[in-house]
Amino acid sequence: MIIEAVDLFYLSMPEITNEVDGSQDALLVRVSGSGLTGWGECEASPLTSIANFICPKSHGAAHPVSYSVLGQELNSPQDIVRISNEVREKSLTILQTPHTFSGIEIALWDLLGKYLEEPVYKMLGFDKTFSKTPYASQLFGTTPDETYEKAKSSLKTGYRAVKFGWGKFGIDLAEDQKHIEAAREGLGKDCKLMVDVGSVWKDDLNEASSRLDMLEKADVQWLEEPFYTDSFSAYKGLSQSTKVPLAGGEGCHNPLMAKNMIDFCGLGFIQIDSGIIGGIGSAKEVADYAVSRDVQFVNHTFTSHLAFVSSILPYCGYEDFIFCEYPVQLKPLAWDITIEHIQLNDEGKIDIPEKTGLGIEVDVEGIKPYLSMVKIELDGKDFYQTPSL
């Protein structure tokens, strides 16, 4: 099979706010060949990645991503590995490349699975999949009372684990204490509580350390992203000062970055987004490495169920990796991207679809209201315009 076309679609809510919520817009990728289509989603700034895909080359290591994808043969997983390596080599110095290619790579797996009539998890080498315990991933409330109500609601819905993140957490010590206490009170003592602070402390070990007592008393399952992704010494120092495991890695945009975090940051959990790191294959490489280093692998997902499935597939065949991030505050755009949605089973867990490819289909009619039409001109000539859905 030949990769005949790669089409990018910029989707957006009518209004984009300053809320740290990646489900407000999306860049979908459609890859076509042999009369079949595969879909993927980039965790990316859509317009930036469109430019990255079609831009003129600047030099030998700054080609557009399209240069290494269009016209390639796609008949086996090894072809995806080969294309991935070529993209990295030919578009090495364009920093947006991993974000852009991630969605394309995901779509390649979907297309190949449909072509070979196999689910992606089997092409990754797994014989079977294991259910994951979802944690209801959401933002902290604007007040401790709102955090408490969110916690109660999640518990009532049936979640055994809940993560609160971002908001204003990490700025005021006294307010942080109130939010943590509210979350724990709302969840009760048996529900797992995770906390994501979105790198709010940059690389300030003292600021992070001042919250350890409250986190330990609340029996927090993990503290996520206390620092920037590359703040290795701060991560390591904090890990040696607390019983609370640290989680991080969503900012990793290649497997080596994630492996370095595993080796040098003292992490208990490595959290990877297939839409950032280079796709499903790159995420699977990290999951395999996490097994060898006795570190828990977890997906990062705060967008659509297309992205959700893509980020669980790399570790769905590992029984000991038990958690998965399950976003519960999606904007309508993110929900409307797919026809199917992955729901909790009778045991309150998540199962991977068994169908060919990714096992989940894009709702073409459902996304049309969110489509942003893009036209790029260069030297007075049309260089790019949004393709037809």
Positions of predicted regions on the chain:
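Extended hydrophobic packing segments that form well-structured cores
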Residues: L358-L389
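Structured beta-strand/loop patches that form or line metal/cofactor-binding pockets in enzymes
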Residues: M1-W39, E43-T48, Q329-I337, T386-L389
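Glycine-rich, aromatic-flanked loop segments that form ligand/cofactor-binding clefts
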Residues: H99-F101, E105-G141
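Shared catalytic-loop signature of beta/alpha-barrel
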Residues: L92, D213, D219, D230-A247, ...
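Conserved, mostly hydrophobic/aromatic
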Residues: I3, G35, I104, E117, ...
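Metal- or metallocofactor-binding catalytic centers and their adjacent structured scaffolds
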Residues: V31-S32, L36-Y115
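Metal-dependent enolase-superfamily TIM-barrel catalytic cores that perform enediolate-based chemistry
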Residues: F130-T242
